[in-house]
C-alpha cells in the first residue's frame, strides 16, 4: 500500500496524469406513471426508449462536476407507461492532462463510473413503482465519444463547404 502511495506522490510531484473520484451523488430523480392504474390492469409489452446526455462543468481548477442525464420511457400504443429521468453526478479531480485528454476523460471514464449508479437508481425506483425490474444494457462510452467527435467533424466540414459555395 505504501508503494502505491509513493507512486502516486511521485506522479503528482512529476506532474503526471491524475484522476480521482471525489464524490458520487444523485442530483435529481423524477418518476412518472402517466397511465396511472391502467399500467397495472392491462396486459401489454411496452417499448423501452433510453436517451442519454452528458454535461460537465469545471467547479474549480482541476475539479469537474460531470452529470449523466438518463431518461428511460416505456411506451405502449403511443402512450407513456412510465418515465424516469435521472441526473447522476460526480465530482472528479483531474490534473496533469491537456484539453483534449480532459475532454475525453470527462466523456468516457466519468460516465462509465456514474452509469451503474444511475442504472441501480432507475431499477430501484421502478421496483418501488411496482414495475418489473429493468436491466439497462451497458453503454460503451468510448464508442459514443468517438461517434460524437465524428459527427461534429462531418457537420463542420458540411458547414465549411456550404460557406464556400455561398462566397
Swiss-Prot record:
One of its GO terms (cellular component) is cytoplasm. One of its GO terms (molecular function) is unfolded protein binding. The keyword Iron does not apply. It comes from the Bacteria. The keyword Membrane does not apply. Transmembrane segments: none annotated. Its main location: cytoplasm. Keywords: Chaperone, Cytoplasm, Protein transport, Translocation, Transport. It is found in: Cytoplasm. One of its GO terms (biological process) is protein tetramerization. Belongs to the SecB family. One of the proteins required for the normal export of preproteins out of the cell cytoplasm. It is a molecular chaperone that binds to a subset of precursor proteins, maintaining them in a translocation-competent state. It also specifically binds to its receptor SecA. HAMAP family: SecB (MF_00821). Homotetramer, a dimer of dimers. One homotetramer interacts with 1 SecA dimer. This is Protein-export protein SecB.
Amino acid at each position: 500500500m505504501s508503494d502505491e502511495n509513493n507512486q502516486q506522490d511521485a506522479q503528482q510531484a512529476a506532474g503526471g496524469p491524475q484522476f480521482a473520484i471525489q464524490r458520487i451523488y444523485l442530483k435529481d430523480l423524477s418518476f412518472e406513471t402517466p397511465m396511472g392504474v391502467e399500467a397495472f390492469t392491462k396486459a401489454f409489452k411496452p417499448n423501452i426508449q433510453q436517451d442519454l446526455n452528458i454535461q460537465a462543468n469545471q467547479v474549480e481548477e482541476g475539479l469537474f462536476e460531470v452529470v449523466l442525464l438518463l431518461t428511460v420511457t416505456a411506451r405502449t400504443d403511443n402512450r407513456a407507461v412510465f418515465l424516469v429521468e435521472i441526473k447522476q453526478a460526480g465530482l472528479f479531480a483531474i490534473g496533469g492532462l491537456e484539453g483534449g485528454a480532459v475532454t475525453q476523460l470527462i466523456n468516457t471514464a466519468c460516465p462509465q463510473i456514474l452509469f451503474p449508479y444511475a442504472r441501480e437508481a432507475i431499477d430501484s425506483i421502478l421496483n418501488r413503482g411496482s414495475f418489473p425490474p429493468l436491466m439497462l444494457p451497458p453503454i460503451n462510452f468510448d464508442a459514443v465519444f468517438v461517434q460524437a467527435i465524428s459527427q461534429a467533424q462531418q457537420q463542420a466540414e458540411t458547414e465549411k463547404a456550404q460557406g464556400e459555395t455561398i462566397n
